[in-house]
Structure formats: C-alpha cells, structure tokens
Amino acid sequence: MSRMLRGGKQMINLMDMSIPGMKTHLRLGTKYNKHIYTDAMSKIVKGVGGKQLFNLFDVSLRDGLQALKTPMLMKTKRDMLHNIISRNVKHIEIGSLVSPKILPQMADSVKLFEYSKTIGMDDINYYMLAPNSKYVSKALDIGVENISLITSVSNQFQLKNINKSLEHTKDDIDKSISIISNSKLQVNNLKLYISCVNECPIVGKISPSMIVREILYYAEYDDITNICLSDTCGTLSVDIFEQIMLILLLEGILPSRLSLHLHCNSNEMERVNSILKVCMSHGVTMVDVSFIESGGCSVTMSEEKINRNLSYLDIYDSLK
C-alpha cells in the first residue's frame, strides 16, 4: 500500500506484494521514498556515468521458493513474475526442471515458463534450472533458450543434492553441453552454479585451492557463459573471496563470465557489503537477488541453518 505525503511525494511500503507466510526483500514496515528508491534501482541496473554497477539476476521464483513445503498457487507465481519484471532486471530464473517428489514447489515450472513467453518482454532472458542432462533435453524440447546447470566443489554435497559424484557430474555436464551444441534450438545463455564456495553444509570448510581447481575446470568450456560462485552456507569471507577472485583473474577468466550468489542474514551485512565492493573493484557485475526473504538448499541443509538469498535492498544499501 502507498500513501501521499506533504508536497505530493508518494511514499511506498516496499513490501509491495503480499505472499502468505513470507517477507519480501524489503523489511517489514520499512518505508522509502518511492522516487529515491526507483532512481537508486535504475542506477544499479543501468549504471552511472556509462558504467554499469550491477547486472541483477533474479532467483526469487526458483531458489527463493524451492524450500517452501506448501506449493504456491500459479496465480501467485504469475504475480511474482510481474513484480520481478517491474524491477527492470533482464535475467529471471523461472523455476527448476526436477522431480516434484523432490521439490513439489517446482512442479509447475514448465507452466510458468510457458506463461512467461506470453508476456511479450523480448529483452528479458528467462532461465530454467536443469539438474542433469535428461532435464537439459526436456528444457530444449519446451523451448528454453537460457539454461542453468549445477555442480559444487564438495563431493558429499553433490551426492546428497543430485545423487552424483563430482566426477559423474563432470561427465553429465559434458553430455549436457554436447546436447545443447547439437540442438536445433539456439541457447543464448548457459549458467553454471558452483555451490559450496567456501563451505559445504555436510563436511565444512573447503580449501580455496579445491574451489579454484573446480572453477578453472569448467572455465575451459566456452559454451558456459556464466560461472556463478555460490556461497551455499552464507559464510564466505571477503578475504577468501578476494583470494579466489585474484587467482581466477590471473588465470585469464574474464570478469564478465563470473557472477555471485550469496546467502546471508540481516545481522552480517558488513561482510556482504565488503564482498560486493570486491565484485565492483574487479568488474564482476552479475549478482543473484531475490525479493523474498528465503532461499537455500533444503535438500542438503536443515531449515535452521539456511540463510536467505541476497535481496534488492541489500544491493541498494551497499551502494549508499
């Protein structure tokens, strides 16, 4: 709801969409001047002085929802999609092609993807996550032109998450890329999430050398347009991140190929802000965000250990 203030300026309660049982990315009760907020988001998305600040990738409909036990109505998901589109982001993950027995919330991802194609926003890249080569084939069959794949730097995590070892995942991703290359459908973007950067929820901390080794392996695939460093546990420190970034850049990986997926809680924003500043200093502009305060890997983590996704407001606050 919004109201008018003196002088005709509109104030907006930035919890501009009600989702039962959930908070949006903007803290409950928080109010901002709508014009100031809109201007700030425009600068984030479009840049300042010709220099882009962040290229936001919205994961609200996939990572933001996947841990919810009660399936959300399609109408609510459609409303969420329009809410996301209104934020001027150009990359939106619609859902995941996965067995509904594993993630019931993703059961209608295909229907939501089909709906997205009727909206008429040709400048938006709609993504679907495909956890293995079988679902990559399905994604291509339904016309998905932007696909997300997943791996990690932890063998135990990968076994629990998708029932494949890291080595078997490598084989399957190679198969997925081959399927995409031989497809009649032109795939515009291929994103690869590399989970457990810094820490695995099962075995604990992962050495930076192991993390870098796995990233460099996948960087050899020219078909992978976006290598996303995913801080699954929400414990990545700025020092470790800086160390990883410097090695990757020295190895010749372009900043434009890298992106970041953070998990956090509202009590540790200094850490998050420092990491985002490192991103900006090295030219890494793509960052995953969600406008609902949820997210995380429910397959491998208990509810009390899951930290939420980075939000739009977190990005906004980091630039103040």
Question: Would you name each region that the model predicts?
Answer:
Residues 44, 74-83, 87-124, 128-138, ...:
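Glycine-rich, positively charged N-terminal anion/phosphate-binding segment
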Residues 55-59, 63, 92-94, 124-130, ...:
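Hydrophobic faces of well-ordered beta-strands that scaffold small-molecule active sites
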Residues 59-76, 125-132, 159-162, 196-209, ...:
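Active-site mouth loops of central-metabolism enzymes
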Residues 74-91, 137-149, 154, 178, ...:
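Alpha/beta enzyme core
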Residues 90-115, 152-164, 198-199, 228-238, ...:
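Glycine-rich, proline-tolerant flexible connector loops at the mouths of alpha/beta enzymes
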Residues 96-99, 119-180, 189, 196-206:
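Active-site beta->alpha loop and helix N-cap motifs at the rims of alpha/beta catalytic domains
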Residues 102-127, 169-183, 188, 242-260, ...:
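Alpha-helix-loop-beta-strand connector modules within alpha/beta enzyme cores
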Residues 232-319:
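Catalytic alpha/beta core domains of metabolic enzymes, predominantly
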